[in-house]
């Protein structure tokens, strides 16, 4: 951009500013020439109860616990609680009724801080409580930011939850928890949220809750599925799990430690963990279903560790490395995960993921091959418009050994690999043909041929 272009823009901005100042000057009182613009009292919920109207200071020094309690005390009435920009130091958070809404001005400007070992926000048997545009910072080594038990359809939108776990202070804060979902809590949604620096970011022992367009950073364990009662599950979409390279910061981004329910991951990014995903336990069990689609996985040691899972499914997953040395992209225990599906997995650490990584019971489709344990029902190969083979059997060098032609005829390309028949006494014979076209047989013995 030329200086002339910049000057023209500056002139335009100056002209617009002067034009905008005219009506303001006309409205100003002549006896208050120093009056500056003052932001009106604005919120998207005009009926909200502003905590500063009930004595909250919001300077990060004063204890605002009692003021928040007064603001939230509405009896049987509906509650919309508003925390304007500020830093509110508390030791407890008030109880909230069903359908309450708690609003701030932004996750980094309306900040609630708590330095005690407590569960700060605790909801039990409540419905559709909403939190939006708030920040919560916990510094108690065994504290929990949010706990929901037997709650339904609660939501967190643009909320920042932050603990105190760092590599430098490990393991002091590994007991800190960001969110705990327990009981029969369901339908909880975390949208555009940040959950950072906890011992465990999210602990869930219940099914059917959702994390969307959010980020979990530098938690020792990002998400823990626990309970071992076939119940824990979670759906994550457009989520980032990130951390640094220090092994004390993050050990797992997702860990499922026993018998659980459905886990669904779509468009999820993982980087900066020893083992990015550790799924199941050989002695305790694992998910009834685990699915990953369109994900990127990087790790220091193992990308995806499938230890126990009834029905794992991975599609369009790319594996990468965090350090200079390549990790194990995917590790599958043949006892705990004998069956599963893997489609279009690629790796930047190798030319391709070897089919031998997966147990024989898996269906694996890669960019140039397919493995499946069996086909059920009638298998159909249909001839195309040309005379191309319907089927080919190739050797490791990709040379054709046998084929089914477009006409349906069988073709063997090797004289020593003709049709093998078994007689009524259990002996095997190979059909042969002489250069003159005379048919014959060659005995192969009673042991089933393998080559």
Where are these regions (language model features)?
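N-terminal export signals
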Residues: 2-4, 10-31
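C-terminal trimerization/auto-chaperone modules of long, extracellular attachment fibers and adhesins
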Residues: 27-43, 363-432
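Acidic Gly/Asp/Thr-rich repetitive segments characteristic of extracellular carbohydrate-active
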Residues: 51-82
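Short, T/G/N/S-enriched strand-turn elements that build extracellular solenoid repeat scaffolds
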Residues: 69-74, 89-97, 225-226, 279-281, ...
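N-terminal extracellular ligand-recognition/capping segment immediately after the signal peptide
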Residues: 73-101, 105-117, 134-140
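All-beta strand scaffolds that present successive hydrophobic residues in beta-strands
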Residues: 83, 101-105, 129-133, 154-157, ...
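Parallel beta-helix/beta-solenoid
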Residues: 101-106, 121-167, 191
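Extracellular beta-strand/beta-solenoid scaffold signature
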Residues: 113-122, 138-148, 168-182, 194-206, ...
């Amino acid at each position: 951009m030329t200086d002339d272009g910049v000057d023209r823009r500056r002139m335009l901005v100056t002209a617009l500013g002067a034009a905008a100042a005219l009506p303001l000057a006309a409205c100003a009182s002549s006896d208050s020439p120093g009056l500056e613009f003052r932001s009106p009292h604005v919120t998207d919920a005009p009926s909200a109860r502003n905590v500063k109207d009930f004595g909250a200071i919001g300077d990060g020094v004063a204890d605002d616990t009692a003021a928040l309690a007064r603001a939230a005390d509405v009896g049987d009435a509906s509650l919309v609680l508003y925390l304007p920009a500020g830093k509110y130091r508390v030791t407890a958070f008030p109880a909230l009724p069903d359908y309450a809404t708690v609003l701030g001005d932004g996750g980094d400007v309306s900040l609630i801080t708590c330095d005690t070992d407590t569960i700060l926000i605790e909801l039990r048997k409540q419905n559709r409580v909403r939190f939006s545009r708030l920040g919560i910072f916990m510094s108690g080594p065994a504290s929990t930011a949010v706990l929901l038990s037997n709650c339904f359809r609660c939501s967190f939108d643009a909320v920042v939850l932050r603990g105190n776990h760092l590599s430098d202070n490990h393991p002091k804060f590994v007991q800190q928890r960001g969110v705990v979902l327990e009981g029969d809590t369901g339908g909880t949604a975390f949208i555009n949220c940040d959950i950072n620096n906890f011992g465990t970011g999210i602990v869930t022992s219940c099914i059917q809750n959702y994390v969307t367009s959010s980020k979990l950073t530098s938690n020792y364990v990002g998400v823990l599925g626990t309970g071992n009662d076939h119940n824990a599950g979670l759906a994550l979409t457009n989520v980032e799990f990130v951390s640094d390279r220090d092994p004390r910061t993050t050990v797992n981004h997702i860990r499922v430690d026993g018998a659980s329910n459905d886990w669904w991951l779509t468009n999820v990014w993982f980087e900066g963990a020893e083992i990015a995903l550790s799924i199941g336990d050989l002695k305790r069990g694992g998910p009834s279903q685990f699915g990953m689609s369109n994900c990127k996985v990087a790790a220091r040691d193992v990308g995806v560790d499938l230890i126990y899972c009834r029905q794992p499914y991975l599609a369009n997953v790319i594996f990468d490395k965090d350090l200079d040395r390549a990790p194990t992209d995917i590790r599958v225990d043949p006892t705990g995960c004998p069956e599963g599906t893997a489609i279009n997995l690629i790796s930047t650490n190798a030319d391709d993921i070897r089919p031998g990584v997966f147990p024989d019971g898996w269906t694996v489709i890669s960019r140039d091959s397919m493995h499946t344990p069996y086909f059920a029902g009638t298998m159909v190969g249909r001839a195309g418009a040309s005379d191309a083979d319907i089927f080919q059997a190739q050797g490791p060098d990709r040379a054709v050994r046998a084929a089914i032609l477009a006409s349906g005829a069988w073709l063997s390309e090797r004289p020593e690999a003709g049709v093998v028949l078994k007689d009524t006494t259990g002996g095997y014979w190979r059909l042969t043909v002489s250069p003159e076209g005379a048919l014959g047989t060659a005995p192969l013995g009673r042991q089933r041929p393998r080559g």
